[in-house]
């Protein structure tokens, strides 16, 4: 969210960079600041840090979108929400990271008014959509695990929920988009290394009264950070309590659920808890600075220190969250990890025709249900969540597994180089 402080980070506050102090001319009441906010080593450090998270964000989240969209077995409720998180992270990487980096390096706002509004709006909508999506994931897991007999959330309802999430994100960020504007700072100029002067512009929220900004910041903090994350904590605490209990009878009078299924569900919950926890910690410093600016009554030197050094780091940490989610998926989830590997292997190994097939078996009642196994080639990517592609997914208690993970059915393991021998993966394992 650009222009966080009541006086924007790059406005008429005294700045000192590159060994050149801000100078004020009493006779004309003019203030001159260095064009760049930091020395060359500090600026280089910021550029490398932002470039790293930008590349991680673009590559990782693009792969997540590719894996989920390419494989219809990944079209599940939880994976649709994960896809929505990846889309919001991509928006942050495309529209917010570059402009924020340049804004943190140069004194003043170097872009036009439209970019000022777009950057602030997209960043605010992305963080709002992310936290609302995390709440939706927690609710969906809560219903599946704590109340397994209730009607499951369908894929269609999940897509409607995602549309509502973005509508709410746009609604709550509209005041910021309206008030964000670029203004010229009177009697304040930037001076470059060749002693050329430039007018100073600032991108900031021009509220009619300062108190209105405080109210809006407090509303944002409570509605898109504090309250949603408190709800997530309660949901996952109930889920953890349920998973720690002994497995009960399966629906339809089936035997007790396979303990391995509970462990798999627990791994899914661990991954989702890590995503929510990392989101909380990543955005906490930026929210703390926003509240400090509005309620702290900082002096000019303190505000200079916060805006020139603290805000760039807080922005970087918040943006790093958008880059870390794919790493969390790959670490905790085997199917996403296989999907990442397959995406890179596909460029080296051509995919043969008919490399993807399904096995079906008839279950009691005369209905054909998708069996536990989905036979895929190594070039195929991940598979759906343990909740299954729909509420009618088979119960994990009846799934024959070998070593609790993958049954190879006597096929040799994949050797060096490219191999097209199929691996059988539990389709319900997220």
Curated annotation (Swiss-Prot):
Transmembrane segments: 44-64, 81-101, 118-138, 159-179, 215-235, 272-292, 308-328
UniProt record, GO biological process: cellular response to hormone stimulus; G protein-coupled receptor signaling pathway; neuropeptide signaling pathway
Glycan attachment residues as annotated in the record: 10, 18, 29, 113, 195
GO cellular component: cilium; plasma membrane
Keyword annotations of the record: Cell membrane, Disulfide bond, G-protein coupled receptor, Glycoprotein, Membrane, Receptor, Transducer, Transmembrane, Transmembrane helix
Pfam family, one: 7tm_1
Cytoplasmic side: 65-80, 139-158, 236-271, 329-430
Record's bilayer topology term: Multi-pass membrane protein
Gene Ontology molecular-function annotations: G protein-coupled receptor activity; neuropeptide receptor activity
Extracellular domain ranges by topology: 1-43, 102-117, 180-214, 293-307
Biased composition (Polar residues): 9-20
Chain intervals for the UniProt region annotation (Disordered): 1-20, 379-413
Biased composition (Low complexity): 379-404
Main location: membrane
Subcellular localization, as worded in the UniProt entry: Cell membrane
Disulfide bonds: 116-203
Xref: InterPro entries: GPCR_Rhodpsn (IPR000276), GPCR_Rhodpsn_7TM (IPR017452), NPFF_rcpt (IPR005395), NPFF_rcpt_1 (IPR005396)
Assigned protein family: Belongs to the G-protein coupled receptor 1 family.
Function: Receptor for NPAF (A-18-F-amide) and NPFF (F-8-F-amide) neuropeptides, also known as morphine-modulating peptides. Can also be activated by a variety of naturally occurring or synthetic FMRF-amide like ligands. This receptor mediates its action by association with G proteins that activate a phosphatidylinositol-calcium second messenger system.
Name under which the protein is recorded: Neuropeptide FF receptor 1
Lineage: Eukaryota, Metazoa, Chordata, Craniata, Vertebrata
């Amino acid at each position: 969210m650009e222009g966080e402080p009541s006086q924007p980070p790059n406005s008429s506050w005294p700045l000192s960079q590159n060994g050149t102090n801000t100078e004020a001319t009493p006779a004309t009441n003019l203030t001159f600041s260095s064009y760049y906010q930091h020395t060359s080593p500090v600026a280089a450090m910021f550029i490398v840090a932002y470039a790293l998270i930008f590349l991680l964000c673009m590559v990782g989240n693009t792969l997540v979108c590719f894996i989920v969209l390419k494989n219809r077995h990944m079209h599940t409720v939880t994976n649709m929400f994960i896809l929505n998180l990846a889309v919001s992270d991509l928006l942050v990487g495309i529209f917010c990271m570059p402009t924020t980096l340049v804004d943190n390096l140069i004194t003043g706002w170097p872009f036009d008014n439209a970019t000022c509004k777009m950057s602030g709006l997209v960043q605010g909508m992305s963080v709002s959509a992310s936290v609302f999506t995390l709440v939706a994931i927690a609710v969906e897991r809560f219903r599946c695990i704590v109340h397994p007999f209730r009607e499951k959330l369908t894929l269609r309802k999940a897509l409607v929920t995602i549309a509502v999430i973005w509508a709410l994100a746009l609604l709550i960020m509209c005041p910021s988009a309206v008030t964000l504007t670029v203004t010229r700072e009177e009697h304040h100029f930037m001076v470059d290394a060749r002693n050329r002067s430039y007018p100073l512009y600032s991108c900031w929220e021009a509220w009619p009264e300062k108190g209105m900004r405080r109210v809006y910041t407090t509303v944002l903090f409570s509605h898109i950070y504090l309250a949603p994350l408190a709800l997530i904590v309660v949901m996952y605490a109930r889920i953890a309590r349920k998973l720690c209990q002994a497995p009960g009878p399966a629906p339809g009078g089936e035997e007790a659920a396979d303990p391995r299924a509970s462990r798999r569900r627990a791994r899914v919950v661990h991954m989702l808890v890590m995503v929510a926890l990392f989101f909380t910690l990543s955005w906490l410093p930026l929210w703390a600075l926003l509240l400090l600016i509005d309620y702290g009554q900082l002096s000019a030197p303190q505000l200079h220190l916060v805006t020139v050094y603290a805000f760039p780091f807080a922005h970087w940490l918040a943006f790093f969250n958008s880059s870390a989610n794919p790493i969390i998926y790959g670490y905790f989830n085997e199917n996403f990890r296989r999907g990442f590997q397959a995406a890179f292997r596909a460029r080296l190994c051509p995919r043969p025709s008919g490399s993807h097939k399904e096995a079906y078996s008839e279950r009691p009642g005369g209905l054909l249900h998708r069996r536990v196994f989905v036979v895929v080639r190594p070039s195929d990517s991940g598979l759906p969540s343990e909740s299954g592609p729909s509420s009618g997914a088979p119960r994990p208690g009846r799934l024959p597994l070998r070593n609790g993970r993958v049954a190879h059915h006597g096929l040799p393991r994949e050797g060096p180089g490219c191999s097209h021998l199929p691996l059988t993966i539990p389709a319900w394992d997220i």
